UniProtKB/Swiss-Prot annotation:
It comes from Bacillus cereus (strain G9842). The gene is rplR. It comes from the Bacteria. This is one of the proteins that bind and probably mediate the attachment of the 5S RNA into the large ribosomal subunit, where it forms part of the central protuberance. GO terms for biological process: translation. Pfam families: Ribosomal_L18p. This is Large ribosomal subunit protein uL18. The keyword rRNA-binding applies. GO terms for cellular component: cytosolic large ribosomal subunit. Keywords: Ribonucleoprotein, Ribosomal protein, RNA-binding, rRNA-binding. Part of the 50S ribosomal subunit; part of the 5S rRNA/L5/L18/L25 subcomplex. Contacts the 5S and 23S rRNAs. Belongs to the universal ribosomal protein uL18 family.
Length: 120
């Protein structure tokens, strides 16, 4: 039986493999996604300078959310992080799915960010 700890360890290994090949620059930063059971978080990161440019999550007070662990909440987080990034002058990003499958909440966040103006 696969336990939650085993799944998370596998995800972390997968993320480490992907991160070895992915780097965010000032011109094209990395859009990182972290998904917990209750919330979803997105950050636009410049890895060269080690700086988070913008971030958004379901914990933000300005996002009026009914539930925080569903695809609608992920969509709102994607729109929010994209709007904040475009305001900072970031138009292109590298998408880092954080070792998660491109499905469900991660996919909803990515598609909402694309529709709100980010290119990846």
């Amino acid at each position: 039986m696969i336990t939650k700890a085993d799944k998370n360890a596998t995800r972390k290994k997968r993320h480490a493999r992907v991160r070895a090949k992915l780097t965010g620059t000032a011109e094209r930063p990395r859009l990182n996604v972290f998904r917990s059971n209750q919330h979803i978080y997105a950050q636009v990161i410049d890895d060269v300078n080690g700086v988070t440019l913008v971030s958004a999550s379901t914990l933000d007070k300005d996002l009026a959310l009914n539930g925080t662990s569903n695809t609608e909440a992920a969509t709102k987080v994607g729109e929010s992080v994209a709007k904040r990034a475009v305001e900072k002058g970031v138009k292109e990003v590298v998408f880092d799915r954080g070792g998660y499958l491109y499905h469900g909440r991660v996919k909803a966040l990515a598609e909402a960010a694309r529709e709100a103006g980010l290119q990846f």
